[in-house]
Amino acid sequence: MKVFFNQLFDYNFYCNKKLIEECIKLDKVPEKSMMLFSHILNAHNIWNARILGKPADYKVWQIHPIKNWGDIHYENQRSSFEITTNATDFEIRIDFDNEEGRLFTSTLQDMLFHIINHSTHHRSQIAMNFRDNELEPLSLDYIFYKR
């Protein structure tokens, strides 16, 4: 399971890094894309914090300047790799409160997979937003990454 999650987080790291690099090159990043990518970073931080049983550093829809994306992304990834490296049981159940204070329980593997799936979902929305703004989206499909 560790190898599987490390591969997925490598993919996530690659995709987010490419998207950050692309946005830095642009004269103007569409506002919706900035909101969505900030949300990806925030959610990743929030899920890591839930797993570790500590408070999150960011709010769900907090907007970050592009110049901060790389550092936030790196810290999120570092934390996730630490979680997967130290995990002894991926089926352990973890209790956490959502943003409204409701208690939920999920397995570690489901929480980790959600981070990846959630990020992929919103990167596809960013790709659509790029097209809507006459920008060329990146090819970030998993199969392209594995080639």
Where are these regions (language model features)?
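General structural signal for secondary-structure boundaries
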Residues: M1, L26-D27, P65-I66, N86-D89, ...
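Short secondary-structure transition/capping segments
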Residues: K2, N68-S80, F130-I143
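Active-site metal-coordination segments of metallo-dependent hydrolases
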Residues: K2-F9
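A structural signal for well-ordered alpha-helical scaffolds and beta->alpha junctions
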Residues: F5, N16, H73-Q77, R123
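Short, contiguous alpha-helical
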Residues: F9-W61, R102-R147
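Helix-adjacent hinge/juxtasegments
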Residues: A56-I94
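A short, surface-exposed loop/turn module that caps and links secondary-structure elements
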Residues: F96-N98
